[in-house]
A protein has these predicted regions:
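Membrane-embedded beta-strand positions of outer-membrane beta-barrel proteins
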Residues: 67-69, 111, 153-155, 192, ...
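Outer-membrane beta-barrel "beta-signal"
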Residues: 314-326
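Outer-membrane pore/translocation modules
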Residues: 129-242
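Residue-level signature of outer-membrane beta-barrel architecture
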Residues: 97-101, 139, 143, 155, ...
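Extracellular loop and loop/strand-boundary signature of outer-membrane beta-barrel proteins
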Residues: 79-85, 121-127, 173-180, 229-237, ...
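Repeated loop/turn-to-beta-strand initiation elements of outer-membrane beta-barrel proteins
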Residues: 107-109, 148-151, 201-204, 258-261, ...
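Sec-dependent signal peptide cleavage junction
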Residues: 37-68
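Transmembrane beta-strands of outer-membrane beta-barrel pores
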Residues: 71-77, 115-121, 157-163, 198, ...
Length: 326
């Protein structure tokens, strides 16, 4: 009989003849084995947790978050004032936040969110009216080629928050008609190209291949007259899409120790039609810091877009208010 068979028989005999003792040894061995296994698993879990925390901490370091929130309140009151005047109340909220990301693989992701929302009331009027209403999101994802230049893909989104109205008087009463709302219009622009960035104070994006879409609620276009358009969208339609090129940028500079100016601009060239027309937008924000919490700001916003209106649009806001820096 082979030796391995004899060995198996002997083992069986020993187990049968000393069953209680060997069962205790077997149980003890199993307890020691599984205790060691659990300890090893706990060490692996602790190591995994530590690696995950290190990764999360590193990702947090890759993000840079900064911005400003400003509240502005204006009020005027007149009584028996010979030269005249109207009582008024105006409130304005301005938010401008940046979220930037850079990792070791040289991927760059820059994001900017801007919100400006204000309302005003004049004595004698039946309705509050908008002083400002604007939401804009910019995002650029890029891969570094060298110190300053990157391959890029960008996204731009613009809309309003509150409904827009046309005010008129009929039969001696003030009336209003809704002419726009949130996401109507909504303007989306996408593009591929090159991104030049020296630092957070200056960048430029060139996109020879860009697409732009204007989206509206069909309720505003279904009753249009023949040839009439709503933000460039024809009767019964809900969008208009074009292909072109874009050039956009941002620059921040100090005029004095407590005065800074932000310049943002965007040019869009349409390849499909109206090639000679260039849509452009320029936004200048001058900030005067009085102290840590009080500041004044002057916003000058120019825009020309043939699809929206065939005239130069001008928006100007000045305010003194409370600032929260983040």
């Amino acid at each position: 009989m082979p030796s391995n068979t004899v060995f198996q028989i002997n083992i069986l005999i020993l187990i049968k003849s000393n069953k209680p003792k060997h069962m205790k040894i077997l149980k003890l061995f199993m307890v020691i084995y599984f205790s060691g296994l659990n300890a090893q698993q706990e060490q692996e879990i602790d190591s995994l947790k530590a690696d995950t925390l290190d990764l999360l901490n590193q990702e947090k370091k890759n993000f840079k978050f900064f911005g400003v929130t400003q509240f502005t309140f204006n009020q005027a009151y007149f009584e028996n004032w010979v030269s005249g005047g109207e009582n008024s109340v105006t409130g304005l909220l301005t938010i401008d936040y940046n979220i930037n990301y850079l990792n070791k693989l040289k991927w760059v992701w820059d994001n900017n969110i801007m919100l400006s929302l204000g309302t005003t009331y004049l004595s004698g009027n039946s309705f509050f009216k908008k002083a400002d209403d604007r939401l804009e999101i910019n995002s650029v994802l890029s891969k570094k080629v060298n110190t300053y230049w990157n391959y890029s893909a960008y996204f731009n989104f613009k809309t309003q928050i509150l409904p827009g109205y046309r005010f008129y008087t009929e039969d001696g009463e003030d009336r209003k008609e809704e002419v726009s709302q949130i996401f109507s219009p909504a303007i989306i622009q996408l593009g591929l190209g090159w991104y030049y960035k020296e630092n957070d104070l200056a960048w430029f994006n060139i996109s020879p291949l860009a697409a732009r879409g204007i989206f509206v609620n069909k309720n505003y276009t279904q009753n249009l007259s023949t040839g009439e358009k709503y933000f460039g969208v024809e009767r019964g339609a809900s969008s208009i899409v074009s292909v072109g090129a874009s050039f956009s940028g941002f620059m921040r500079s100090k005029l004095m120790e407590n005065i800074s100016i932000d310049n943002k601009f965007n040019f869009y060239f349409n390849y499909l039609y109206k090639i000679k027309n260039i849509d452009f937008e320029w936004n200048a924000n001058i900030r005067l810091k009085v102290n840590e919490k009080i500041s004044a700001s002057l916003i000058v916003h120019l825009q020309y877009d043939d699809d929206l209106i065939k005239r130069l649009q001008i928006r100007e806001l000045f305010g003194l208010g409370l600032v929260i820096d983040i």
